[in-house]
């Protein structure tokens, strides 16, 4: 969930200075500093499950997996975000002059919240597509069994796939990992 903190336009340097001294995380989008609010139990559980699935599947392979607390810089938009889950090939590439901001994800996953789902699907995805290394995007619904996947096939061409049955297999071609939708939603309870 994202809640707005300020309406003043900031410079990226001001944002980065705030983040160094802040106990809370913020995203930096179009000059705005936006507080990242706490998520629901389903959001946390799904993020944790995906993180675990990827870590186990990629053990011994040249990837690092990050969940929720690793900042990503989107250079073309000069945005800073904290994706729910990222797969990053090693060696990790960091923003010049920084030791805490990644620039080369191949896979990004976002667990959708009611307040951010349109933003995650539209503006955020458009920004992520500008990252040269970015190959695959997962949008995971926390309110019903549904995973949407965008896979890059070549420059400016993406294939969309949707999964809504527990037995459906999601194939992440960018990192050669496959898992069932049912595994991702294990022990998740949907409220009416």
Residue ranges and their predicted role:
Residues 1-192:
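Gly/Pro/Ser/Thr-rich low-complexity, intrinsically disordered segments predominantly at protein N-termini
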């Amino acid at each position: 969930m994202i809640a707005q903190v300020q309406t003043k336009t900031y410079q990226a340097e001001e944002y980065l200075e705030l983040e160094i001294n802040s106990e809370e995380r913020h995203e930096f989008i179009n000059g705005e500093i936006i507080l990242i609010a706490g998520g629901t139990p389903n959001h946390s559980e799904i993020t944790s499950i995906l993180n675990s699935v990827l870590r186990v599947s990629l053990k011994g392979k040249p990837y690092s997996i990050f969940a929720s607390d690793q900042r990503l810089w989107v250079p073309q938009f000069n945005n800073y975000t904290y994706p729910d889950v990222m797969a990053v090939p090693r060696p990790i590439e960091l923003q010049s002059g920084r030791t805490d901001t990644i620039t080369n994800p191949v896979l990004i996953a976002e667990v959708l919240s009611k307040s951010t789902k349109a933003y995650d699907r539209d503006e955020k995805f458009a920004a992520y597509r500008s990252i040269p290394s970015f190959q695959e995007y997962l949008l995971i619904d926390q309110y019903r069994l549904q995973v949407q996947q965008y896979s890059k096939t070549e420059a400016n061409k993406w294939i969309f796939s949707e999964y809504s049955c527990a037995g459906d297999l999601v194939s992440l071609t960018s990192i050669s990992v496959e898992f069932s939708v049912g595994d991702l939603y294990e022990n998740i309870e949907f409220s009416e």
